[in-house]
Amino acid sequence: MIKSDQET
């Protein structure tokens, strides 16, 4: 599993 974080 790939963990990706997005914050805008």
Swiss-Prot record:
Induction profile: Expressed in both exponential and stationary phase in rich medium; expression is considerably higher during exponential phase (at protein level).
Taxonomic superkingdom: Bacteria
UniProt name for this protein: Putative translational regulatory protein BaxL
Function: May serve a regulatory role in expression of downstream gene baxA; in a baxL-baxA-lacZ fusion mutation of the start codon to a stop codon in baxL increases expression of beta-galactosidase.
Other noteworthy facts: This gene lies upstream of and overlaps baxA on the same strand in another reading frame.
UniProt keyword annotations, A-Z: Translation regulation
GO biological process: regulation of translation
